[in-house]
Amino acid sequence: MNVKEYMQQLGQAARKASRLLARADTNQKNAALHAIADAIVREQEALLAANRQDLDAARQAGLDDAMLDRLTLSAKGVLAMADGLRQIAALPDPVGEIDDMCYRPSGIQLGKMRVPLGVVGIIYEARPNVTADAAGLCLKSGNATILRGGSEAFHSNQAIAACVHEGLAAAGLPAEAVQVLATTDRAAVGELIAMPEYVDVIVPRGGKGLIARISAEARVPVIKHLDGNCHVYIDDTANPDKAFNIALNAKTHRYGTCNTMETLLVHTAFAEFMLPRLAEAYWEKGVELRGCERVRAILGEPVKAATDEDWATEYLAPVLAVKVVKDIDEAIEHINRWGSHHTDAIVTEDYGRSRRFLREVDSASVMVNASTRFADGFEYGLGAEIGISTDKIHARGPVGLNGLTSQKWIVLGDGQVRS
């Protein structure tokens, strides 16, 4: 069987399973999630052995330390996967929820019911835990899923898939509800993103190159974000302590996440007071600063000159671009021009400016007096997330269970006909 035939077979099976899964009630889905979690705990040694096999191959292939870190499963990580599935089971089931019921003049009753998307294709790199997270979220939201993990995590993903299938069987659900590709052939990705008759949406999770390729080539809708070029703007009305703590946390809490601040904007009236204090804190943590001419005039030689490339870059590293702006107008203009529409924050004590920032900054998450690091499914109360979307359709921001559903109109009548 060639790759095209294999993927067609998976797609057909997923479509059939999606119809069965859409009918499954909450108790059955939760039973499957708990059974999968139990299987993961029970098969911990097998999972770790499979992961060691992947790690050995990765080292022989010369993968860097960052990739090895993402690939590594620990005993603690295995238990965390199981706990994550139990947390998904504890979340409210969005499927079947009915909103906005109302009577129309004709006498019909109208509303919207939340329903699964159908079949979700998920393409990701390195992290084996994504296999369990993605399977759990799709299962709870009533979607069948086809998972394509990175080839470097092949054995880990297959071992996790075996636990998933064991849990599905225990709950009386079809194994085809969650299918993990049993091939490392890259042609499988091209087939997966070009099967609109079987796949309803694609969610890519990985590097910019992967996501850009899928966005360009997919014949199926894509939920994605390319970059996390996030900003914090410190207004001249900001509380100095709030500004310091937020600007420090947003950059240094973790460097490699998509909600980490990459550019700091400071009002000109606040710059000479705030920048030296912040710079010392950044330098203590090993953060390299790249600034505009005004920033360099205030802070001196340690600051490299920032270029347009710096304003546009998601560093994912201890590097920060810093710019002094004359007012909120320039701050908003800079963010909307150079940002990635992911997450941006203002620090201000002025109510009018905070509301203006919320209205005019064109990002999936816009914050007032809070760190950009809060842009996260768990922090938003969504539970686990499948990813973060910077698109405006279909989902925007952290995508949890609700983001894996859509709504259909329902009409209840009592014999009405249209005149």
Curated annotation (Swiss-Prot):
Key words, A-Z: Amino-acid biosynthesis, Cytoplasm, NADP, Oxidoreductase, Proline biosynthesis
Any single GO BP term: L-proline biosynthetic process
Function, in words: Catalyzes the NADPH-dependent reduction of L-glutamate 5-phosphate into L-glutamate 5-semialdehyde and phosphate. The product spontaneously undergoes cyclization to form 1-pyrroline-5-carboxylate.
Record's protein name: Gamma-glutamyl phosphate reductase
HAMAP family: ProA
Stored PROSITE patterns: PROA (PS01223)
PANTHER family in the record: DELTA-1-PYRROLINE-5-CARBOXYLATE SYNTHASE, GLUTAMATE SEMIALDEHYDE DEHYDROGENASE
Name of the gene encoding the protein in the UniProt record: proA
Compartment(s) of residence: Cytoplasm
